């Protein structure tokens, strides 16, 4: 499969050099220490917006819209889209890529969370159930084995 022209990493911080680190979510696909990025600009922005406040969220597999389970994005916050060269990245899973090296962004864009409302919505129970179907390690909010679902890529 051909690599995309650019990859994207969303964050609440403007980061000059992205350093490999271990994600905080419970997905086994995110067990490696690295710099996580996506080929989908709207996913990087949507996840950064969701993380602008304490939320539990997941990406809808079909629409790529971010489904919020708990909490709500901070509409007053600003997030940053780090545009990356894919040369040091390998595909981890579908539209997700991973680099084991430090990555310097080609460009960094600033976005107001209030301008990104089209990238997320409140999740229905049906959507959450579908999402959790093949993810035994994940737990819905309220299940105290794992407090909540957090993304950090």
How would you label these PLM feature ranges?
Residues 34-54:
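Short, well-structured hydrophobic secondary-structure segments
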Residues 12-14, 36, 73, 144:
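Compositionally biased, intrinsically disordered low-complexity regions
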Residues 13-15, 42-44, 87-89:
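Short, solvent-exposed loop/turn segments at secondary-structure junctions
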Residues 47-153:
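Conserved NAD+-utilizing ADP-ribose enzyme module
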Residues 8-11, 38-39, 84-85:
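Short His-Asn-centered micro-motif
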Residues 1-32, 49-50:
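ADP-ribose/NAD+-binding catalytic cleft of ART/PARP-like enzymes
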Residues 3-6, 31-35, 41, 76-80:
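Short, surface-exposed beta-edge/turn micro-motifs
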């Amino acid at each position: 499969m051909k690599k995309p022209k650019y990859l994207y990493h969303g964050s609440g911080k403007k980061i000059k050099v992205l350093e490999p680190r271990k994600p905080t979510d419970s997905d086994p696909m995110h067990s490696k220490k690295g710099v996580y990025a996506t080929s989908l600009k709207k996913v990087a922005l949507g996840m950064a917006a969701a993380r602008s406040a304490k939320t539990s969220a997941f990406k809808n597999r079909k629409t790529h819209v971010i489904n919020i389970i708990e909490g709500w994005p901070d509409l007053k916050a600003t997030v940053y889209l780090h545009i990356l060269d894919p040369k040091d990245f390998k595909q981890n899973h579908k539209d997700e890529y991973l680099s084991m090296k430090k990555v310097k962004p080609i460009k960094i864009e600033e976005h107001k969370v209030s301008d990104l409302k089209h990238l997320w919505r409140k999740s229905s129970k049906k959507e959450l159930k579908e999402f959790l179907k093949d993810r035994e390690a994940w737990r819905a909010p309220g299940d105290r084995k794992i407090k909540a679902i957090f993304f950090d890529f």
